[in-house]
């Protein structure tokens, strides 16, 4: 592949890397679903449930209808567990084998660096309470936050649900507990050593090696990307990301390229492919890794996308829960969707096509996607 890409070539490289190049094939096993997550490196989770929990949608977008129970098995069934929860991009499902690559982040949290400073101060002021919560999990886990609240007494008396939640977040960030399973999407926490394989927990890797591996995973999943794009995928520290990128280039894993219309230098993964065409049609979760980095989405697709869930209704441009529509290598429209669980119907609250796109060219593939999603 040449060291200069047209914007159309860049889109095809990216879509192939993000697993949109092959014809949808419904996974029949938990391991098959986990393999897709492994190729993406990470799938974001979110509590918003207007349509469906967000972590189910990226897999649907790439492989069509599948049994959601299979993803639950891959994430939480002890004998089939191939995924774990941690802060990858945001709250995420990650391939089990990547657990050691996040230990540096757990150590940063333990030291209270950066965004963890507030939690560190909180647990420092509540040491005995933290110890009591951890002991309860050891004795009775897995437990949800509500099952711990007020269950023991610290030096200041009974503590409440919000304090338990803060403590559990701290224990989760630092790797002392993890998600054993979910109950109506509520995390049930247990000691990490009781959930994940001991051989995995025994692996030690340096911060530099771990970040370098995360950079490579990002590059494989993105195909071609700028430093900003690569850093954002796993939210690496800015200075560390720049150094890891330099090392990956020196190793030959990443190749500097120019992309039509991009001001910044781009980097192509050495194994990236550029298919002749990408014919996929897919509705995308607002939390899909293809469109995480909003500036990247505009650079690649000329598509301005912002999440409007927290925007007052009268100020929204497109709707509350809007899914971009990918068709034949372009983002051609968007739909505001909602699941009416009482009637069992999929509601289309609104929609539009992008400027220059003929409605007649997208109506039929969009209808097919909606029909598939409604199942």
Question: What residues fall within each predicted segment?
Answer:
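Long, charged, low-complexity, helical-prone intrinsically disordered regions
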Residues: 1-375
């Amino acid at each position: 592949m040449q060291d200069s890409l047209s914007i159309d070539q860049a889109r095809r490289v990216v879509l192939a890397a993000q697993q949109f190049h092959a014809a949808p094939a419904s996974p029949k096993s938990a391991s098959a679903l986990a393999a897709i997550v492994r190729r993406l490196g990470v799938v974001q989770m979110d509590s918003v449930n207007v349509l469906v929990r967000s972590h189910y949608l990226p897999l649907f977008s790439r492989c069509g209808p599948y049994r959601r129970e299979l993803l639950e098995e891959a994430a939480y069934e002890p004998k089939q567990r191939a995924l774990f929860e941690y802060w990858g991009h945001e709250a995420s499902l990650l391939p089990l084998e990547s657990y050691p690559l996040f230990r540096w982040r757990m150590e940063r949290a333990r030291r209270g660096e950066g965004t963890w400073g507030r939690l560190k101060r909180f647990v420092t002021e509540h040491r005995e309470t933290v110890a009591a919560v951890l002991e309860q999990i050891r004795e009775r886990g897995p437990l949800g936050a509500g099952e711990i609240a007020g269950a023991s007494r610290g030096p200041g008396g009974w503590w409440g649900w919000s304090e338990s939640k803060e403590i559990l977040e701290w224990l989760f960030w630092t790797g002392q507990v993890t998600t054993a399973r979910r109950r109506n999407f509520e995390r049930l926490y247990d000691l990490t050593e009781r959930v994940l394989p001991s051989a995995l927990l025994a692996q030690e890797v340096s911060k530099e090696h771990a970040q370098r591996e995360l950079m490579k995973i990002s590059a494989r999943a993105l195909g071609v990307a700028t430093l900003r794009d690569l850093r954002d995928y796993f939210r690496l520290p800015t200075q560390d990301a720049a150094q890891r990128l330099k090392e990956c280039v020196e190793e030959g894993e990443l190749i500097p390229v120019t992309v039509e219309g991009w001001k910044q230098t781009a980097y192509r993964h050495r194994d990236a492919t550029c298919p002749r065409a990408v014919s996929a049609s897919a509705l995308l979760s607002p939390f899909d890794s293809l469109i995480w980095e909003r500036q990247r989405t505009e650079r690649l697709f000329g598509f301005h996308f912002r999440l409007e869930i927290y925007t007052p209704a009268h100020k929204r441009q497109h709707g509350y829960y809007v899914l971009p529509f990918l068709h034949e290598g372009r983002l051609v429209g968007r739909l505001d969707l909602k699941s009416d669980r009482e009637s069992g119907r999929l509601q289309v609250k609104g929609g539009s096509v992008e400027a220059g796109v003929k409605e007649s060219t997208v109506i039929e593939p969009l209808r097919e996607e909606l029909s598939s999603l409604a199942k």
